[in-house]
Amino acid sequence: MANQGKKPTRRSERALAFQVLYGLSFTPATSEGALRAAYAASPDVADRNAEDEKADRQAPATAPQGYAWEVIHGVWKTQAELDEAVSGFSQNWRVERMGRVELTLLRIAVYEMLFRDDVPAKVAMNEAIELSKQFGDDNSRGFINGILDAVARAVESGRLTPKGQ
């Protein structure tokens, strides 16, 4: 039986998604195959796959799965829309000028707010702020909180919705 360990938490899955997406901010994936390769190359995913192979040597290779992959794939597919939303709520900051850590965390949280009905806006905000403590600097939290608070209010009021909906 594959992977008998504990199921990863949403927070650990978000951290994995952050790490993969942050890496992609330096070398963007131009195809879904490249995105899958970046995900598979992540040390956490490679470790999981090694554990799975030990547990079941006959198991066929499976497609990426889990919350981290859903977030990575979702952010990758909707990045232009996410950047437009972030830009619209960041006063005097173009996304091109934002730090990669902050922008990656903003993309993840805005993706969750817009496209994940199972994630309340306040949870997406809190998780981004918690991850900023781990990966960002002292100024990251305030910057991220300010933008995400405005995005959350716009989503809750219906002023910001996913395109095509």
From Swiss-Prot:
GO biological process terms, semicolon-separated: DNA-templated transcription termination; transcription antitermination
Taxonomic superkingdom: Bacteria
Organism field: Nitratidesulfovibrio vulgaris (strain DSM 19637 / Miyazaki F) (Desulfovibrio vulgaris)
Gene Ontology CC: one annotated term: cytosol
Entry protein name: Transcription antitermination protein NusB
Family that this chain belongs to: Belongs to the NusB family.
Keyword terms: RNA-binding, Transcription, Transcription antitermination, Transcription regulation
Gene encoding the protein: nusB
Pfam families linked to this entry: NusB
NCBIfam families: nusB
Biological role stated in the UniProt entry: Involved in transcription antitermination. Required for transcription of ribosomal RNA (rRNA) genes. Binds specifically to the boxA antiterminator sequence of the ribosomal RNA (rrn) operons.
GO molecular function annotations of the record: RNA binding
